[in-house]
From Swiss-Prot:
The gene is tal. It comes from the Bacteria. The keyword Transferase applies. It is found in: Cytoplasm. HAMAP family: Transaldolase_1. This is Transaldolase. The active site is at 132 (schiff-base intermediate with substrate). It is an enzyme of class 2 (transferase). Pathway: Carbohydrate degradation; pentose phosphate pathway; D-glyceraldehyde 3-phosphate and beta-D-fructose 6-phosphate from D-ribose 5-phosphate and D-xylulose 5-phosphate (non-oxidative stage): step 2/3.
Amino acid sequence: MSNKLAQLRKLTTVVADTGEIDAIKKYQPEDATTNPSLILKAAQIAEYAPLIDQAIAYAKTQSNDKAQQVQDTCDMLAVNIGKEILKTIPGRISTEVDARLSYDTERSVAKARQLVKMYNDAGISNDRILIKLASTWEGIRAAEILEKEGINCNLTLLFSFAQARACAEAGVFLISPFVGRIMDWYKAKEGRDFAASEDPGVLSVTKIYNYYKEHGYKTVVMGASFRNIGEILELAGCDRLTIAPSLLAELEAAEGELVAKLVDSKGSKARPAPMTHSEFLWEHNLDAMAVEKLAEGIRNFAVDQGKLEAMIAAKL
């Protein structure tokens, strides 16, 4: 019998949640996802130094203003890392818009267009890129605009059913509902561990997946943020799962039969009327975990973006 990673690949598209080329080469995922924290981590690897130097050189041709140079370097570095990753995978790279723009639709759209242009100028077509945006109301509206322009989006930091519903109604290409961070919140609140089948994060993704399939939404569900392989195995059959290298290694070492837990019902239930802004805010607000985790996630990504900018500024 093959290992559980090999079996999972037959049920689900496996995505690598890393910016590290060596790990991607080793596990040969279909797609890869990055975020500000992963870009910061990757930027500290020696082999990435030329990518930073190249990004700095580019930024200096764009502006004489140091603050603008820092911004342009960070954007080009994310694209440079994305370009390197695309050499080793057949599918798409997800590159994230600055988390500090999470509540600004207009600036999120502008930043997304800029990142896509950088990829396009390097000869990379839109069908190999996903733009990551936080699943705020403003981020979802930005994605709605971008999707109509042929720029596919990955809506991240998704914790509530309200966020998932709004994303589907906006016609976004893909969502990344977080599993482990949901479990973290309930574990801290209730002071107990959860079996994988009862894991609140697993139950959240399962509910979203079934709702999408029952109502015929095309938005791809990509479970993210895993704490253990038990969570992953409980979501076997999900459209996609983005998994850190350490957990890919555990899956590769695990034996035993793996069965699909999520199955596409191919339903055609009538869809409800799209949520209004006020309905979205109220429904999301009713979920204390989601409110806290969305805000925390945006803050943490912004902190790591700031650290990256400080690192870049010191090199300019």
